[in-house]
């Protein structure tokens, strides 16, 4: 249970280790990252079992997350060698202009519990590839996955001080977070978590004008038009909505279905949800595990109660599961309207609220009626509609006829109050680098 002083020690260790790491050729850093990737994949089963025991997601999902998390290490091992600058035509006959990229410095990474491996590697891998040391504060609920990753990183050859893990209790999290965001030695803060906490960290970081990346809350719309393949839409919704018990920032939270296919879609969804197996994550047939804690369970109950009081109907689930603890039944709500909490707040649970809409423009208006703008999904077979809706939705990412969109090769991030910056892809490396402009005179 570390505190502010322990955090300062970790920052000092990162500061001291930085010069040697940044001086290494990119190819050497890439080699270390590649060895880390290999070790993570060699220990995929061990890491998955640890994750399931610590966080609760089904073992099959945990295995998938380990592979997904490792993909960022592999990707940025390759991108480390591609931190290209620019040569720009000079503004005078004797002028030459060059732009180079340099590592920004000590990075603070604050990560969530819902993806305790992937959210760390998605930040640490590009930072290390760029030549930066990192201090990671993992979520209080899932410190063990972070420590396991650090052990493997050390075995891969990451030098002492380059990857530092600061674990703490919920009581000490505010002081650790404040130290990371206010220390002049930290030049970059990367945070994944709730929008209110992101705003707090942003305010704290402003005192030293740090570069900040924020991947915050989402309340993703999932739109089903009347020309869609309904079976494909149900499959996509199941993958997006109930994965990780609905505890993902990009999961479908507001399902908008066009009136002409609404009833048929509800019946198809009920059939699919009825096949979900709720249970302990280490049991082989489990599709849905428990919610992370009692507060999460209480929020799900509150959202369902609010919806039913305002006229929504529970057509499946709606209760705590017979298994007890924080298990909850996969739930479907119909006749949901925009004035309910499920429309304005991120539920973060296994609840699928179905809204009805009439026209394309109405669907766009309803989908954009949110302070969040992380992800969106829609199903249609009309190419004109696909382009129009994709351009009109106010989100950073859109799944078109697809319910799973995350990949290391594409930029992950949102707009509006869902965050700043992008993770993954070739753009992810730039988040940990500074541009430096060199003007050479007297070149004639």
What is the predicted function of each stretch?
Residues 1-53, 75:
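Short, structured beta/alpha segment
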Residues 1-2, 16-23, 109, 222-225, ...:
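Short, well-ordered beta-strand elements within core beta-sheets of diverse protein domains
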Residues 1-2, 186, 223, 277, ...:
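Conserved C-terminal structural/oligomerization subdomain of aldehyde/semialdehyde dehydrogenase
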Residues 14, 29, 51, 73, ...:
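Residue-level signal for inorganic ion chemistry
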Residues 16-23, 38-45, 56, 78, ...:
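Generic secondary-structure signature for well-ordered alpha-helical cores
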Residues 61, 72-93:
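Phosphate-binding beta-alpha-beta segment of Rossmann-like dinucleotide-binding domains, i.e.
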Residues 85-232, 357:
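Rossmann-like NAD(P) dinucleotide-binding subdomain of oxidoreductase/dehydrogenase enzymes
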Residues 196-337, 366, 400:
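ALDH superfamily catalytic-core signature
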